[in-house]
Structure formats: C-alpha cells, structure tokens
Amino acid sequence: MPTLKIRGAELYFDTYGEPVSGRDPILLIHGSYITGSVDWSGVAPRLAQEFQVIVPDCRGHGRSDDPAGRYSFREMAADAAALIRALGHKQAHVIGHSNGGNVALVTLMEHPDVVASCIPQAANAYVSADLVERIPKKLDPERVRVEDPSLMMEMIELHSARHGVDYWATLLRRTAAEIVSEPNYTALDLARVQRPTLVIEGEHDATNAPAAHGRFMAQHIQGSQLWIPVGIGHNVHTDAPAAWCERVLEFLRAVPALQRH
C-alpha cells in the first residue's frame, strides 16, 4: 500500500502510468467525504495514457490518517504541495473536484511554485450566502442518518477501517464547518494568479452554479478558460467522462512544460 508521511499525516495515494518526459504529472484531489479512487477511477486511466497521474486520499479520508484532526482546505493544499515535492516533482497539474476543487484553488493561490496548471471543478473562491444557508443542514449527521442512510453507509464503508465506525459523523461536521468558513479569495486575490487555469462548472451544478462561482473565478483569473458543460450537474467527470477527458487533455497538452517556462 503506497503511503508517505506528509506533514505529520500518513497519506495513501495511487499512481497511474509512468513519468512522461517533458510533462509534469497530474495530481487529482477528490471531493467531500469520499476517496481518491471513488472520485477519479473513471477518468484516471485515460489521463494516464498521456500523463502520470497521482491520486491521494486527503488527510482524514479513506486510507489516510489525520492524527491532529486538522481538516481544512489550507491544510490539504499544503499536503498537496508537500506530496508533489516528496514524490520528486517540481510541479504538477493540480485538478480538484468539489471541495477538492477548493483545495486545488488554495494550492494555486498559496503554493503556486508547485502548480504547473490548475483545474478547479465545482469549486468556489469565496463563501457565498447560499452555502452558509444550505450546507450545515445538508451535512447534519442526524439528517443524513434519517434521510440519506445510503450516504451514511457509504461513508462508513470508505472510512471506518482507518478511522472507526462513528467517524463518518465527525467528518461531516468538519466538512460543513470548513465549507462555511473558507476559502475567502477576492477578485484582487485571483488577479494575482499566473498559472494556466481551466475552470469547470456544470450548467446545473446545484452547489456552485446558483452563485456563479465558476464565472467569478474565470472572470478574475487572467487568461483562464471557462467550460460550462450544458445539461450537466456537479459531477462533470463522472456524468460525462469522455467529454471531460477530451477537454481536460486538450487544455493540458497546451500548457508549456516546466523546462520551457
């Protein structure tokens, strides 16, 4: 089982493919309360035909521990940067989905030296009022236990072996607390970005489309691209994997390799 000690946590990760000369690897960051393999197994093999792909379980998720209980986008972004370096890479193409998209964005903002390019999908640069209103109710463990027991059982299956059978409720509470707190980037903050960026947001993403978070990021990150797939919701890469891979690989092929920067 491949693991590395990263900033006090034992992080599990999978790799797909071998290093490709002249091409930085891809780092895929999973979304809320799931794992890397659950989120990315449908697209990682296709990406690995052209790039090496690294897929970790974020701290406190799946097979990665979190002994200090430090759940935050900033902590996970620092982990991402440290993992890239620990694996011997100077940079990686950092792609994230949902809360993983937030982690990808924070990695871009706080650790730009390790980012060759960034693809935040279904992410938000700031905490909008609708998130504060909806998320604590949606992720309340008692509501989930009664109204969405399948989610509870999935979380128990994914996380209990490493973290205990009751950990799912703790993870939901930590996730909700972070979503209504971070990130908090302004238009001026985003204007500082100097890395190629592709923002992805499904047309019908119920989490982020109402506040037009994707458009906000793309509007203020200089030179960024925005892809809004028509008729798709929060999970573009699983709902339309072929189209997603085609668009992402088209973008990545155009990113100059590190040695040509």
Enumerate the predicted regions with their spans:
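Flexible "cap/lid" loop of the alpha/beta hydrolase fold
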Residues: 102-110, 114-151
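Active-site loop/oxyanion-hole signature of alpha/beta-hydrolase fold enzymes
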Residues: 41-48, 54-95
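Catalytic active-site module of serine/aspartate enzymes centered on a nucleophile-bearing elbow/loop
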Residues: 224-261
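Conserved alpha/beta-hydrolase "acid-adjacent" motif
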Residues: 206-213
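Acidic beta-to-alpha connecting loop that harbors the catalytic carboxylate
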Residues: 32, 203-206, 231-233
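Active-site nucleophile elbow and catalytic-triad environment of alpha/beta-hydrolase enzymes
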Residues: 173-189
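Short beta-strand/loop motif that positions the catalytic acidic residue
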Residues: 193, 199-201
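Conserved HGGG/HGGXW glycine-rich cap/lid loop of the alpha/beta-hydrolase fold
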Residues: 9-63
